[in-house]
Amino acid sequence: MERDCDIVDLDQPSLGTVISIKDGSTPTDISTTSSTTEDKLCSGCGCLIKDRYIYRVMEDSYHESCLRCSCCQLSLSSFKKCFSRHGNIYCEHDHQMLYGKRCRRCMTLLLPTDIVHRVHFMYYHAQCFSCCSCQRPFNLGDEYHVFDGEVFCRNDYQSICNFQTISNPDPLMEEVVRSEIHRKTPKRPRTILNAQQRRQFKTAFERSSKPSRKVREQLANETGLSVRVVQVWFQNQRAKIKKLNKKDSDSGDTFKHGPGSEGRSTEDIRSSDDEEESVINLDADEVETSETSSYTDPIQKLYNMTSSQIYFPYHS
């Protein structure tokens, strides 16, 4: 966490050197010597230099016509200084364009006369130093935070941390948090219960599967969750119990639908399940994924039917 920012003048010798020359780029003075004393090979064309004068750049020798910028092919014989990088020769302008420092926000070149803000390895124009999310400019003394290579104000950084704590407790899921920073549409929150909260919910469910509002509010205060989350959990739990009971009833050998039997039909049970399922899916908070009704084997259903339910056509 950074609590203030550094203002750096690129005219200073320390940063002036960094901006104009870095990573092997070496400014060299171009000197000329007489070629009468010894023969030299041109580093540009590879031919023997027989001219009256030899142009030297560091340890290399050039013809006057061969000493050119590798980018724009400008003749450097009339310049007092050039730049060498990875065996290539550049004029000052092209070297700045290719290897000069750039503003992190607008990506334009930083000039030696610019006043810039430096944050770790990043550089910003004074007018470009602002929050990546809300675009609010920073002033001297303002608190800012660096996350994923971007600068955020305190409020936006707190929002990112809260989102990471609620939706992604696992630090290995940091990539998901990064993608959510630039989302335009909000994502539905998902509540994950810990072991203590699950035990409290199960204990309350054993007492009553449909607790009153007062009990739900008390349970919400004890667990630190909202009343709506508590209500959704009980709805999901009742739906699961109902499904398991229905599955056991369909697979049991003693369960039979006689002419005088009481109870709801299969259509009534499916309709009730669909109704409760719709209530769960319309909630804004998701506690656990609700399960759909199980599939009943038609052969097993036929096996459980009594003879009075099976129609035998009369044959004369």
Swiss-Prot record:
DNA-binding region, residues: 186-245
Biased composition (Basic and acidic residues): 246-256
Region span, Disordered: 244-297
Gene3D superfamilies: Cysteine Rich Protein, Homeodomain-like
Pfam families to which the protein is assigned, alphabetical: Homeodomain (PF00046), LIM (PF00412)
Compartments where located: Nucleus
Regions crossing the membrane: none
Gene Ontology annotations for the cellular component aspect, listed alphabetically: nucleus
Keyword flag rRNA processing: no
Keyword vocabulary terms for this entry: DNA-binding, Homeobox, LIM domain, Metal-binding, Nucleus, Repeat, Zinc
Main localisation: nucleus
Alphabetized CDD domains for the sequence: homeodomain
InterPro entries according to UniProt: HD, Homeobox_CS, Homeodomain-like_sf, LIM_Homeobox_TF, Znf_LIM
Domain of life where this protein originates: Eukaryota
Disulphide connectivity of cysteines: none
LIM zinc-binding domain: residues covered: 40-101, 102-163
GO biological process, one term: regulation of DNA-templated transcription
GO molecular function: DNA-binding transcription factor activity; DNA-binding transcription factor activity, RNA polymerase II-specific; metal ion binding; RNA polymerase II transcription regulatory region sequence-specific DNA binding
Function: Transcription factor. Required for the terminal differentiation of sensory- and motor-neurons, especially GABAergic neurons, and for morphological aspects of uterine development. Plays a role in the cell-type-specific regulation of glutamic acid decarboxylase unc-25. Involved in promoting sleep-like behavioral quiescence, acting by modulating expression of transcription factor aptf-1 in the single sleep-active ring interneuron RIS. Plays a role in regulation of RIS differentiation.
UniProt protein name: LIM/homeobox protein lim-6
Top-level taxonomy: Eukaryota, Metazoa, Ecdysozoa, Nematoda, Chromadorea
